[in-house]
Amino acid sequence: MDPLQLLQPLEAEIKGTKLKAHWDSGATITCVPEAFLEDERPIQTMLIKTIHGEKQQDVYYLTFKVQGRKVEAEVLASPYDYILLNPSDVPWLMKKPLQLTVLVPLHEYQERLLQQTALPKEQKELLQKLFLKYDALWQHWENQVGHRRIKPHNIATGTLAPRPQKQYPINPKAKPSIQIVIDDLLKQGVLIQQNSTMNTPVYPVPKPDGKWRMVLDYREVNKTIPLIAAQNQHSAGILSSIYRGKYKTTLDLTNGFWAHPITPESYWLTAFTWQGKQYCWTRLPQGFLNSPALFTADVVDLLKEIPNVQAYVDDIYISHDDPQEHLEQLEKIFSILLNAGYVVSLKKSEIAQREVEFLGFNITKEGRGLTDTFKQKLLNITPPKDLKQLQSILGLLNFARNFIPNYSELVKPLYTIVANANGKFISWTEDNSNQLQHIISVLNQADNLEERNPETRLIIKVNSSPSAGYIRYYNEGSKRPIMYVNYIFSKAEAKFTQTEKLLTTMHKGLIKAMDLAMGQEILVYSPIVSMTKIQRTPLPERKALPVRWITWMTYLEDPRIQFHYDKSLPELQQIPNVTEDVIAKTKHPSEFAMVFYTDGSAIKHPDVNKSHSAGMGIAQVQFIPEYKIVHQWSIPLGDHTAQLAEIAAVEFACKKALKISGPVLIVTDSFYVAESANKELPYWKSNGFLNNKKKPLRHVSKWKSIAECLQLKPDIIIMHEKGHQQPMTTLHTEGNNLADKLATQGSYVVHCNTTPSLDAELDQLLQGHYPPGYPKQYKYTLEENKLIVERPNGIRIVPPKADREKIISTAHNIAHTGRDATFLKVSSKYWWPNLRKDVVKSIRQCKQCLVTNATNLTSPPILRPVKPLKPFDKFYIDYIGPLPPSNGYLHVLVVVDSMTGFVWLYPTKAPSTSATVKALNMLTSIAIPKVLHSDQGAAFTSSTFADWAKEKGIQLEFSTPYHPQSSGKVERKNSDIKRLLTKLLIGRPAKWYDLLPVVQLALNNSYSPSSKYTPHQLLFGVDSNTPFANSDTLDLSREEELSLLQEIRSSLHQPTSPPASSRSWSPSVGQLVQERVARPASLRPRWHKPTAILEVVNPRTVIILDHLGNRRTVSVDNLKLTAYQDNGTSNDSGTMALMEEDESSTSST
């Protein structure tokens, strides 16, 4: 507008009311008639200076029109009936030409777009006119910024303000580029020079054209800013929903974030420092947590009425099939963006073309592909020199991961380099360079992918190799894939069966498919013939955890998913066969120094109280080159399963192989044992011999022994040979059959202790002879083959002795009742001598009651540490902390004299050995203790601390792990110190350093309820100069003080341990005890099965063989004495060891 026209009244409108507006060059804020602001709420107050003075006035945010154009601005109320306009609120009335640093070649960009467009000639001319018509929309200068006329955004920071950050070192090459950006933004009001309590570091990033982009590291600010709920849609979702018409256009909103104003109250958060001056943003900064969401939401809202438009941050995509319609919609978009205050960069835009770049991909009619720009970046990659460069390369490659079927396998060697990096240094070889170039070549040759069609069903094709899974997604009826996914199996998954690997791959594919399906059905094609039959897979054939199988099987019940067998899936190349004993099968037995054939067998035990009778057979054979038997063993194992016998036989052979020089072959007919030894044993050894459920393996001691043997002698080969074959079938048939025969013989060796039948006693009763225990006054008769006794209490049955234990067990097992209830139930029908005694004996052997019932005996009394007779004999030491930082200190070393309880406190910065020695050196200048007692912390168990104590002649003593009671004196002092510090430091916990002397004085002059004296009195014999000091000792001479002090100390000496209870028990070797179950679940046994005490360490500590077969040192507090002590059994392993000793002695003779 001509400047003279600004002197004339302008047409304005507020809330539908027309009035006049005047342009005031001196106004700093727009003023409107106060009648229009009665229903508005002020947003802030402002100090207004006029010729009449200064005055605080409310500021409002109002929307109105000037010359038919919408204006949104901050306003004040005025008594006039017209509007006074602030020139900055209507800059379009009188625009000054924008002058920035670098002018962009706008005309060249427009010519390029006109040449590249696919529009017909007539529409090209219309496009040229649009360029001229909307000249104000295009970016004319680098760093040019729009001005979005909306209510300013307020940046909320939550309850905690961010901390100012130091500036990073800046590359000198970046400074000229950054200075130009700052100067241009200052001219446009995007930046202002303003001091702030906050500071954010500037982080220049190089651009491909050699210039530098100004980026600010707002991570510290973003930590304190609440994330708004509205977030941008994922780019994959946008790409799958865009319209792919004949004509496509992409527009780039340059510096879009900087067009959005923020409130003045938010300026301080955005501050940064450049060249010694601090600047703040008046617009939405890049790098701010919520900037993308706020900006995208505004653009989407502006263009919501335009069809076939998608916006993602500052990129806008529009497509139509008709060229005229496409131009008409483009003009609408240009008009909306211009009125909104945005600026469009034609340099990065593409208008009405058949193929365009959007969100990093080349968008075509059918789908998406890698752009030429991206492919050129790949070709420009050079071998990395450090870890950061390698991570940058992997990040670039990862963008195209879905374009090739085996991406994860190709990049796995490069990720291995990252995992093995030593700091920023990497080990890069020529093979790695070749691998990188191969990946780049494969990606540059990758075909385009099809976009997801939401109108069709989703197809998934799944296959797997021993090390990886392969997934491809298709639209139904299409041959071009939507995407590829390649999944590398983890260490646990690599042990799965081939079917389980397919199910794992299928699971990974279906997780992604749920997003891609868009409500349509999912059809899964795989090499699995029948998914329903998989449910019946036997448990021994499953390697995966049950929870995985539950997850896999839930897909069968999902109505959205259908499973199909596809035998046409391409065969995967280079898939190795199932691992077998290749080494053993390719070598002749004569090439081994010795061959052992092993087998195990078990039969039903003739004793009804036992399940099995197991035995193992081992044949030591040598091929020289004929088959020759060197030695053979047939060993009974007792009540064990055939599986244990198979494992024990291999273990026996492994131990024998250790004595033989040269390679040894061990042959077993157990597929489980051979597979476990060759495949599973290394995994078990690495994870502590746990199964897939993270529980200890069965027969863990045997497997540990086999693992040790294989480690000591790596040339032991264990192979599987099918058993029970016809003679001369293979080289190993004869040896295998011999081992089977020896094992069967061993299983039939049963040790039975027979007792004479008592039926003869019953016959004697019927004949008038009375064995001991049968009263003569009772009448004994035979009725229906049962012996009946008539007693004063009634008629009862006298059962044979062989049936009595079964009768008691049946009565007891109904409800696992106690001895009295069980006795009453049995005696209601039966009688025999010593019935109550037999009931008690039987109940004491009930396994369920043993592991569930509480003990009725107490453990021995707690051993008290021997209390020293003199001060300085023994010190207890420990650390308190970490505490809140105070004067740079975090911990306190507490030293307590054992006899007196006197405390010394030393603040330290860390619980280290050097800090401990430094503090104790100060203390030992007074006196050197004989003993130092501590826990097993690193500060007290180091070699440095041990050397220091040895030099001082101090004996070190440590408490039992996880048993703080053994350091009770210092632990109680720690509690007192923390409690006293808490009370003294309410509201100021970081001031504890200054109060340590006060705390030490208070503790040393506090009376002990047990001794009735203070630690200061016990150490020095007199009170300190504190309030409530004892005045009775003030008139005593020093000799009298010392005599009184010795009398007091003697009276405080206590015995080592209190007297034992009448119901306590003392441990001894051979006693049967039961260990308490740690944290038993509900309705679970509270005690483990009985085991014998192997060694008594002290009256309260013993060594037992735990339920896993390991020797463990335990406290008697966690044991109960087994009620029945006469049922000890021999150790099977001991029997086996004894047989080996007999054999060795035989061979030596």
From Swiss-Prot:
Swiss-Prot/TrEMBL cofactor(s): Mg(2+)
Domain Integrase catalytic: 867-1023
GO molecular function: aspartic-type endopeptidase activity; DNA-directed DNA polymerase activity; metal ion binding; RNA binding; RNA-directed DNA polymerase activity; RNA-DNA hybrid ribonuclease activity
Amino acids binding Mg(2+) 1: D252, D314, D315
Segments crossing the lipid bilayer: none
Compositionally skewed regions (Acidic residues) per UniProt: 1139-1149
Reactions catalysed according to its record: Endonucleolytic cleavage to 5'-phosphomonoester; DNA(n) + a 2'-deoxyribonucleoside 5'-triphosphate = DNA(n+1) + diphosphate
PTM comment text: Specific enzymatic cleavages in vivo by viral protease yield mature proteins. The protease is not cleaved off from Pol. Since cleavage efficiency is not optimal for all sites, long and active p65Pro-RT, p87Pro-RT-RNaseH and even some Pr125Pol are detected in infected cells.
GO cellular component, one term: host cell cytoplasm
PROSITE patterns given in the database record: FV_PR (PS51531), INTEGRASE (PS50994), RNASE_H_1 (PS50879), RT_POL (PS50878)
Note on how the cofactor is bound: Binds 2 magnesium ions for reverse transcriptase polymerase activity.
EC number: 2.7.7.49, 2.7.7.7, 3.1.26.4, 3.4.23.-
Record region (Disordered): 1127-1149
UniProt binding sites for Mg(2+) 3: D873, D935
Pfam families membership: Integrase_H2C2, RNase_H, RT_RNaseH_2, rve, RVT_1, SH3_11, Spuma_A9PTase
Domain Peptidase A9: residue ranges: 1-143
Active site: D24 (for protease activity)
Gene Ontology BP annotations: DNA integration; DNA recombination; establishment of integrated proviral latency; proteolysis; symbiont entry into host cell; viral genome integration into host DNA; viral penetration into host nucleus
Domain Reverse transcriptase: 186-363
Positions with a binding annotation for Mg(2+) 2: D599, E646, D669, D740
UniProt keyword terms in alphabetical order: Aspartyl protease, DNA integration, DNA recombination, DNA-directed DNA polymerase, Endonuclease, Host cytoplasm, Host nucleus, Hydrolase, Magnesium, Metal-binding, Multifunctional enzyme, Nuclease, Nucleotidyltransferase, Protease, RNA-binding, RNA-directed DNA polymerase, Transferase, Viral genome integration, Viral penetration into host nucleus, Virion, Virus entry into host cell
UniProt miscellaneous comment: The reverse transcriptase is an error-prone enzyme that lacks a proof-reading function. High mutations rate is a direct consequence of this characteristic. RT also displays frequent template switching leading to high recombination rate. Recombination mostly occurs between homologous regions of the two copackaged RNA genomes. If these two RNA molecules derive from different viral strains, reverse transcription will give rise to highly recombinated proviral DNAs.
Oligomeric form and interacting partners: The protease is a homodimer, whose active site consists of two apposed aspartic acid residues.
Purpose of the protein: The aspartyl protease activity mediates proteolytic cleavages of Gag and Pol polyproteins. The reverse transcriptase (RT) activity converts the viral RNA genome into dsDNA in the cytoplasm, shortly after virus entry into the cell (early reverse transcription) or after proviral DNA transcription (late reverse transcription). RT consists of a DNA polymerase activity that can copy either DNA or RNA templates, and a ribonuclease H (RNase H) activity that cleaves the RNA strand of RNA-DNA heteroduplexes in a partially processive 3' to 5' endonucleasic mode. Integrase catalyzes viral DNA integration into the host chromosome, by performing a series of DNA cutting and joining reactions. This enzyme activity takes place after virion entry into a cell and reverse transcription of the RNA genome in dsDNA. The first step in the integration process is 3' processing. This step requires a complex comprising at least the viral genome, matrix protein, and integrase. This complex is called the pre-integration complex (PIC). The integrase protein removes 2 nucleotides from the 3' end of the viral DNA right (U5) end, leaving the left (U3) intact.
PANTHER family registered for this protein in UniProt: PROTEIN CBG26694 (PTHR37984), PROTEIN NYNRIN-LIKE (PTHR37984:SF5)
Protein's name in the database: Pro-Pol polyprotein
Organism of origin: Simian foamy virus type 1
Organism classification: Viruses, Riboviria, Pararnavirae, Artverviricota, Revtraviricetes
